[in-house]
Amino acid sequence: MCCALGPGGEPSCKDDRVRHDDVFRLNEPRRVAVLAVHTSPLAQPGTGDAGGMNVYVLQTALHLARRGIEVEIFTRATASADPPVQRVAPGVLVRNVVAGPFEGLDKYDLPTQLCAFAAGVLRAEASHEPGYYDIVHSHYWLSGQVGWLARDRWAVPLVHTAHTLAAVKNAALAQGDSPEPPLRTVGEQQVVDEADRLIVNTDDEARQLISIHHADPARIDVVHPGVDLDVFRPGDRRAARAALGLPLDKDIVAFVGRIQPLKAPDIVLRAAAKLPGVRIVVAGGPSGTGLASPDGLARLADELGISARVTFLPPQSRPNLATLFQAANLVAVPSYSESFGLVALEAQACGTPVAAAAVGGLPVAVRDGVTGTLVAGHDVDHWADALAGLLRAPAPAAAAMSRAAAAHAATFSWDHTTDALLASYRRAIREYTTERRGVGA
């Protein structure tokens, strides 16, 4: 019998040997250690390195907790004010691990701090009774490196989600963008080789893992991300525009995301510049190589002579983002690389059609010709034609596309994501039990 503090600080006294054996006999996880080294799930999407992955980590944790599974998320502390532990919701903790200086570390510097981060993770686990976690789920390759160590130390399976791959990003670099370093490619290969199961967003991403990193197809699970249908839902366009102070009588194209070459916000401005009278709303903050020129997009708007037609907004809260999607005639997602594209899904959940690049997971998130338009390549004229086609659609066709967009997005709930995630966890535990512990048949 071992007594320790539970996730909420309450005493927890259990015969852990029995509990852990039950987990591996029943293939049911009770506690999950989630690793998100380079960005906190509590960070505002659209700032720094925060984006779809942050939303994914937080939403899956919340939904797992609602099913009685405790989740502890480990992320690197980025401010001295970050508390060591934050209770986000019943059953969900975020542990801010001190690993390196709080400020001034770029994501590409973080490999130098993985040892410090891993030490913090192991210390946290040591404060619990032995066998506290039943599974480790790492997000992004940096976390996978730490998850590899934790898996071996704790004797539990490692599930890994890459979110993006260096080789895929490097094959589709925007002009002026910097390639991912060889170090990352090596690190990703190691994690793919070591993980017990690999979770991908789409079948296309599964094929990439197999062709680039020679992943075993039998160890890959396709789990589509979801959308919060309570927040992102159709609304009154005029009311949404009034709330945001946007004109009621103009066509509006919205871009939402981090301001960096990878996301291609410049394509939206250049294409919209060819469409007289169209207003553009850009919501997001500079990130990655975009930090080198945080005002670059505003300067581009000035050079194109459309500054009066462009509204720049900082990263928005989820309710405000839903209002922006409701206000827009369409949302543009012209990324050069996108493993899925949650923004496209969230926009469609609000009944707003999407013009998206035909890359990565976007052909899954957007049904071409039904819920929006997929654009091959990044030719500005092609993008201008795509935007114009959606904006000039007859009212009945536009209304039908809006309904189809909302219906399509409704099939991607976080409950569905959690069902598939738990199925992957169960497979990981069952296989780990059989292959590594020699238990079962």
Curated annotation (Swiss-Prot):
Mg(2+) binds at F325, Q326, A328, T352. InterPro entries: Glyco_trans_1, Glyco_trans_4-like_N, Mycothiol_biosynthesis_MshA. CDD domains: GT4_sucrose_synthase (cd03800). UDP-N-acetyl-alpha-D-glucosamine binds at Q44, P45, G52, R258, K263, Q316, E338, E346. Its EC number is 2.4.1.250. SUPFAM superfamilies: UDP-Glycosyltransferase/glycogen phosphorylase. It catalyses: 1D-myo-inositol 3-phosphate + UDP-N-acetyl-alpha-D-glucosamine = 1D-myo-inositol 2-acetamido-2-deoxy-alpha-D-glucopyranoside 3-phosphate + UDP + H(+). Keywords: Glycosyltransferase, Magnesium, Metal-binding, Transferase. 1D-myo-inositol 3-phosphate binds at H38, D49, A50, G51, G52, M53, N54, K107, Y140, T164, R184. It is an enzyme of class 2 (transferase). One of its GO terms (biological process) is mycothiol biosynthetic process. GO terms for molecular function: acetylglucosaminyltransferase activity; D-inositol-3-phosphate glycosyltransferase activity; magnesium ion binding. The keyword Glycosyltransferase applies. Catalyzes the transfer of a N-acetyl-glucosamine moiety to 1D-myo-inositol 3-phosphate to produce 1D-myo-inositol 2-acetamido-2-deoxy-glucopyranoside 3-phosphate in the mycothiol biosynthesis pathway. Homodimer. Belongs to the glycosyltransferase group 1 family. MshA subfamily. This is D-inositol 3-phosphate glycosyltransferase. It comes from Mycolicibacterium paratuberculosis (strain ATCC BAA-968 / K-10). The gene is mshA.
